[in-house]
């Protein structure tokens, strides 16, 4: 292919260099690859030697993009792969994921627990809504089931009661049947099971579904 005749630092990017072969611009790469592949002026470079350089160039680009994405918000493995797939090949993405996992920057179990805690403590969601939110974030079914398996039933009941009381203040002037229906629908939307909804309504309103 030719002889490397110059390796030039880019003026506007300290992390990148321009490689010239036979006195003509050949390629721009990350500076660290010069050391990784021991590239020097006077070295001959051929097609076989170029491929791993280009692969590592794409790997660094993909890794940098992934780190930038993660700097804004935690991502599941699935969602991060989806965001990288428009620009990078699968083998490059897998290398990036392996790197991120090695530093615990991508960990679906940890992410799932964070989402559960936020949904329970801040958003007052029930188990069904939490499971759907986890699925929407790209968490797999087994990790979802593990994350919600330790949900505290008393806390879930307290959250449902809190939401029911707030909704009751908005609908308390309506007739008994409508109050029951509207609170029930709201709690169902928030992801609570029928049994919890029934217990909440019975305690809050002193009647159950058979009274209406």
UniProtKB/Swiss-Prot annotation:
Domain of life: Bacteria
Major site of localization recorded for this protein: cytoplasm
UniProt cross-references to Gene3D superfamilies, sorted A to Z: Winged helix-like DNA-binding domain superfamily/Winged helix DNA-binding domain
BP-aspect Gene Ontology terms: regulation of DNA repair
Short name of one Pfam family: RecX_HTH2
One Gene Ontology term, aspect cellular component: cytoplasm
Signal peptide span: none
Keywords assigned: Cytoplasm
Subcellular location: Cytoplasm
InterPro entries, alphabetized: RecX_HTH_1st, RecX_HTH_2nd, RecX_HTH_3rd, Regulatory_RecX, WH-like_DNA-bd_sf
Its biological purpose: Modulates RecA activity.
UniProt similarity note: Belongs to the RecX family.
Protein's recorded name: Regulatory protein RecX
């Amino acid at each position: 292919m030719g002889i490397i005749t110059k390796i030039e630092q880019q003026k506007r990017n300290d992390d990148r260099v321009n490689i010239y072969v036979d006195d003509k611009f050949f390629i721009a790469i990350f500076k660290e690859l010069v050391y990784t592949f021991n590239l020097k002026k006077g070295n001959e470079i051929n097609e076989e030697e170029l491929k791993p350089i280009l692969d590592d160039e794409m790997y660094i680009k993909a890794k940098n993009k992934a780190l930038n994405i993660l700097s804004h918000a935690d991502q599941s493995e699935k969602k991060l792969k989806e965001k990288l797939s428009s620009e990078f090949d699968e083998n490059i993405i897998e290398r990036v994921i392996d790197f991120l996992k090695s530093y615990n920057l991508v960990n679906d179990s940890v992410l799932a627990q964070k989402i559960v805690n936020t949904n329970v403590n801040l958003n007052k969601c029930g188990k069904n809504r939490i499971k759907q939110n986890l699925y929407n974030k790209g968490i797999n079914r087994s990790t979802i089931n593990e994350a919600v398996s330790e949900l505290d039933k008393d806390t879930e009941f307290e959250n449902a009661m809190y939401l029911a009381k707030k909704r009751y203040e908005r609908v308390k002037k309506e007739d008994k049947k409508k109050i029951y229906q509207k609170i029930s629908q709201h709690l169902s939307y928030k992801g609570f099971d029928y049994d919890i909804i029934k217990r909440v309504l019975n305690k809050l309103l002193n009647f159950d579904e058979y009274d209406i």
